[in-house]
């Protein structure tokens, strides 16, 4: 009989089949585990997004008297803001050519000046977030609220003429509620700058305070004049609390340089426009972008439990016109870029493309910013495409 060496033994078909069974079982277990994790993540995301308030259209019977509280005296039967053609600036072409979903995602953040329990009013802050997936850039563009723009010519039967950009939000809200405010502001941006907004997020003053506090405050660097102004603000708040009979106030020690500011202080910092004689709405929007960047920087440092608390707090305080499916799509698109984004700060109108002028407004003569819309449309497109433009700040 031929010698059968130990290296000549072949595994039986039964043994080979058993090995394959083990491999298949392992693969099946991995697939099931991934399925469970994805399912849990899906339901987690769904439960969180369901906490967000939804913008709704509410047709309102608004008199000229009610509108005058927001923007001045208007005729009750025809709420038209008229301005002569000789004083109306040239408007840019209205055909939008960027900012649609695909290469870019545009989400508009609206900070409105209504406080908790109050009706929403003017848009105190208008900030556009543009994610460019090709250049991995997140651009934050602040729109100056005194910008003199053409409002939609015929918004659901209402004609509006020319006015400050934040009035667009106020009129939309007065006529059709939160969804109307967002829609009218979006149309105003598209008609004047060619910007296509994919979705809106709105929050009021009280929301900012609560969200920042949930994050444990924000690290903000104060200049000497900013420190002086913030100290005055703390003293005013403390006096107000005492007047109301509230025995506590979250007094914090601040100084020139980097400070961890609580929600009250961050809100005051972001809204202040008279820190010194040279201060203006332009510097105010710079401070607002600094706050946003500080929030983004803080978020990535939070533990899972801290982040979950911030998410729960924030989602219940904001209002959006996005559907749950749209939000999930944008979140999934954003996630791969979250830790590898170049942040760019931008202002619209850009420096050198606008000038101050006194014009006739519904509530009398007022100062506005007249704008070279063609130049700003070109600059916006360049910045959103990831090009370096003088006057923008890259981080």
Residue ranges and their predicted role:
Residues 2-10, 20, 37-395:
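Non-catalytic, solvent-exposed segments at the cell envelope interface
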């Amino acid at each position: 009989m031929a010698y059968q060496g130990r290296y000549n033994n072949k595994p039986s078909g039964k043994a080979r089949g058993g090995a394959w069974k083990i491999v298949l079982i392992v693969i099946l277990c991995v697939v099931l585990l991934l399925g469970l994790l994805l399912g849990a993540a899906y339901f987690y995301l769904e439960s969180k997004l369901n906490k967000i308030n939804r913008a709704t259209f509410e047709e309102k019977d608004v008199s000229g008297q009610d509108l005058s509280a927001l923007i001045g005296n208007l005729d009750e039967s025809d709420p038209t803001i008229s301005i002569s053609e000789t004083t109306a600036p040239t408007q840019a072409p209205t055909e939008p050519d960027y900012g649609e979903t695909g290469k870019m995602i545009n989400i508009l953040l609206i900070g409105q000046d209504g406080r908790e329990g109050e009706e929403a009013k003017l848009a105190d802050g208008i900030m556009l977030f543009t994610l460019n997936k090709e250049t991995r850039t997140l651009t934050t563009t602040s729109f100056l609220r005194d910008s003199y723009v053409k409002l939609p010519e015929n918004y659901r039967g209402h004609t509006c003429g020319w006015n400050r950009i934040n009035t667009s939000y106020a009129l939309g809200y007065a006529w059709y509620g939160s969804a109307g405010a967002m829609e009218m502001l979006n149309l105003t941006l598209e008609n004047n700058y060619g910007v296509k907004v994919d979705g809106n997020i709105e929050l009021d003053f009280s929301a900012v305070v609560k969200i920042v506090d949930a994050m444990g405050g924000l690290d903000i660097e104060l200049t000497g004049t900013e420190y002086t102004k913030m100290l005055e603000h703390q003293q005013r708040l403390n006096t107000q609390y005492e007047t109301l009979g509230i025995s506590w106030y979250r007094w914090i020690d601040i100084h020139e340089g980097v400070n961890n500011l609580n929600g009250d202080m961050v809100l005051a910092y972001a809204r202040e426009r008279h820190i010194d004689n040279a201060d203006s709405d332009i510097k105010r929007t710079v401070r607002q972008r600094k706050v946003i960047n500080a929030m983004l920087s803080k978020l990535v440092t939070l533990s899972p439990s801290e982040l979950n608390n911030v998410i729960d707090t924030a989602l219940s305080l904001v209002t959006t016109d996005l559907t749950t499916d749209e939000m999930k799509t944008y979140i999934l698109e954003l996630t791969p870029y979250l830790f590898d984004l170049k942040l760019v700060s931008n202002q619209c109108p850009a420096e050198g493309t606008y000038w101050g002028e006194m014009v006739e407004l519904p509530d009398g003569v007022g100062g506005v910013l007249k704008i070279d819309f063609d130049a700003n449309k070109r600059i916006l497109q360049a910045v959103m495409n990831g090009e370096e433009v003088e006057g923008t700040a890259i981080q």
